[in-house]
């Protein structure tokens, strides 16, 4: 599911796929969150092959991890509703800052080269939607940063709604699959 957004060019979409990743990270820890992020990318590639020579997938992985890691590290330091909220806010802020800088420094220039178009053409797509977009930095400030803030807030709110009911199911399933049966003696 990818939802277009009115304030950014059409190649930017809100994708709620961080939701199961954050839930998994809350349930099983930061490493599990990163591994789930990686598996998410692999599944996406099986369902829909890359159209960006893996640059988009790299971006999705890195930006996703920039939210998941702070959120889950903070939550696992002392599991409570407060640390979940602080973790999600921190994760959203880190994702917004990292995603904005990553787009400005690496992704936009790489996509421009990859698609054989001047960087100004990409900036022009942002200008067509918002007259305040005049360069790379205003592009990421008015198009990328709001996208990441909205995505982080949406994933965080949905995680708060879904985590508590899913947590016992996830943990019971995990415990059942990892319990070793005593060996039988013959």
PLM ranges: what are they?
Residues 1-27, 31-36, 52, 67-75, 159, 163, ...:
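Hydrophobic transmembrane alpha-helices
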Residues 3-15, 54, 78-185:
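Membrane-embedded alpha-helical hairpins and interfacial helices in multi-pass inner-membrane proteins
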Residues 15-23, 58-66, 153:
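Membrane-embedded alpha-helical segments of multi-pass membrane proteins
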Residues 19, 34-38, 57-62, 85-90, ...:
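Hydrophobic alpha-helical transmembrane segments
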Residues 36, 40, 47, 67-71, ...:
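Alpha-helical transmembrane segments and their lipid-water interface positions
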Residues 48-86:
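Alpha-helical transmembrane segments and their immediate interhelical/interface regions
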């Amino acid at each position: 599911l990818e939802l277009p957004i009115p304030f950014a060019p059409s190649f930017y979409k809100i994708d709620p796929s961080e939701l199961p990743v954050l839930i998994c990270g809350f349930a099983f820890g930061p490493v599990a969150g990163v591994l789930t992020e990686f598996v998410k990318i692999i599944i996406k590639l099986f369902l829909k092959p890359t159209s960006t020579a893996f640059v988009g997938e790299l971006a999705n992985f890195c930006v996703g991890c920039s939210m998941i890691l702070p959120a889950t590290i903070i939550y696992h330091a002392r599991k409570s509703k407060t640390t979940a909220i602080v973790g999600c806010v921190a994760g959203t802020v880190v994702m917004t800052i990292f995603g904005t800088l990553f787009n400005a420094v690496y992704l936009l220039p790489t996509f421009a080269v990859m698609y054989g178009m001047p960087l100004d053409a990409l900036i022009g797509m942002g200008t067509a939607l918002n007259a305040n977009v005049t360069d790379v930095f205003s592009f990421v400030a008015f198009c990328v940063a709001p996208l990441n803030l909205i995505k982080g807030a949406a994933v965080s709110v949905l995680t708060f709604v879904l985590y508590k009911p899913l947590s016992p199911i996830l943990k019971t399933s995990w415990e059942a699959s990892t319990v070793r049966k005593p060996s039988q003696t013959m």
